[in-house]
């Protein structure tokens, strides 16, 4: 194959954002891929990923399910396609993909599971996504790092550019702006553009022809870096599910078959990253007629026994476009 043919060839990669709830927190399945030559695990986590094999995979989704199980010994349940990532210059794991000099186009998927089952696969772990985006968790109030770390850094970046500061202010709810939990991807990409995301320095060095070391966290406030552009893909997945729970009942893909309304609220709060008003949340659930009482109680609540419910999955046939509005708990 000629050099020009090689440089214009394309390899399709598949990446999975697999989300579960564990101990009240949203967690994501991560892997540490091994170097193709040294067989040493990466110092940074990434998402489960692998190449699409048109000879062996009938569809993208089947290919995704196959390599996620192979890498993590975990079987995916609910899956939906997220986005296609194909920007030139992406720091993609070429050796692991067998890509050589080919352009890598990644198709991202979102997977939801009710249980963060320990995979027992080496270099695989469930990690709280707040480790990667610590500014996204408002369940216990406004994160101090927004005003103590991010605001000063973004002001230095914006300088005298009013437009850039306006973008940062609106994205991160600075100077009185209102927080929008769905703008996860916009916030990460703004940090990347400002050079505050550690992956940005790595990618700039590579674009200049250098062989940079893996990025390290510049500050805990900026989140743990990931391999390739996997943190961008993860941000896309978080944005998607935060928006989708409001118009599709996908949150029930994260719930067991039987649950209490308190457990349902904690799950929604873990995903949305904001505290909800208990009574108003229950009114929303009752109004949408999404759940049905089982006439039994869960005694394992640490307090007064609570009624058990189930998701009325049969309602999807009549009302597929429904979700849960978020009645926020105001200060």
Regions found by a protein language model. Give the residues of each.
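Acidic, metal-coordinating catalytic segment for phosphate/diphosphate chemistry
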Residues: 1-15
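Long, low-complexity, polar/charged, intrinsically disordered or flexibly structured peripheral segments
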Residues: 182-220, 224, 228
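Charge-enriched amphipathic alpha-helical scaffolds
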Residues: 275-294
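Short beta-strand scaffold segments in enzyme catalytic cores
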Residues: 14-18, 109
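Long, intrinsically disordered, low-complexity Ser/Thr/Pro-rich regulatory/activation regions
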Residues: 103-105, 111, 289-331
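Conserved Nudix-box catalytic region and its N-terminal flanking loop in Nudix hydrolases
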Residues: 25-74, 82-88, 244-269
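Active-site segment of metal-dependent pyrophosphate-handling enzymes
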Residues: 54, 62-202, 244-251, 288-292
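A mid-sequence, solvent-exposed acidic-amphipathic segment
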Residues: 208, 215-254
């Amino acid at each position: 194959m000629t050099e020009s043919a090689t440089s214009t060839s394309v390899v399709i990669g598949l990446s999975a954002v697999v989300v579960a709830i564990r101990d009240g927190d949203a967690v994501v399945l991560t892997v540490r891929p091994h170097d193709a030559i040294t067989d040493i695990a990466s110092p940074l986590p990434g998402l489960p990923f692998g190449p699409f094999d048109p000879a062996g995979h009938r569809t993208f989704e089947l290919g995704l399910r196959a390599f996620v199980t192979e890498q993590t010994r975990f079987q995916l349940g609910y899956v939906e396609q997220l986005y296609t990532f194909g920007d030139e210059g992406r720091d993609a794991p070429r050796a692991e993909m067998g890509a050589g000099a080919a352009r890598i186009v990644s198709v991202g998927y979102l997977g939801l599971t009710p249980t963060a089952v320990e995979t027992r696969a080496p270099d695989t772990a469930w990690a709280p996504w707040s480790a990667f985006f610590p500014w996204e968790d408002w369940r216990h109030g406004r994160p101090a790092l927004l005003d103590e770390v991010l605001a000063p850094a973004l002001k230095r970046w914006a300088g005298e550019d009013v437009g850039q500061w306006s973008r940062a202010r609106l994205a991160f709810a600075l100077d009185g702006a209102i927080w929008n939990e769905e703008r996860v991807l916009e916030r990460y990409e703004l940090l990347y553009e400002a050079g505050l995301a550690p992956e940005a320095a790595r990618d700039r060095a590579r674009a200049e022809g250098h062989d940079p070391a893996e990025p390290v966290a510049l500050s805990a406030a900026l989140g743990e870096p990931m391999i390739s552009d996997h943190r961008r893909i993860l941000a896309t997945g978080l944005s998607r599910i935060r928006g989708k729970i409001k118009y599709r009942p996908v949150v029930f893909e994260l719930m067991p078959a039987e649950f209490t309304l308190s457990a349902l609220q904690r799950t929604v709060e873990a995903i949305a990253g904001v505290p909800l008003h208990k009574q108003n949340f229950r009114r929303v659930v009752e109004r949408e007629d999404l759940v049905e009482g089982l006439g039994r109680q869960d005694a394992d609540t640490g307090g007064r026994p609570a009624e058990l419910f189930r998701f009325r999955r049969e309602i999807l046939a009549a009302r597929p476009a429904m979700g849960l509005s978020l009645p926020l708990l105001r200060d």
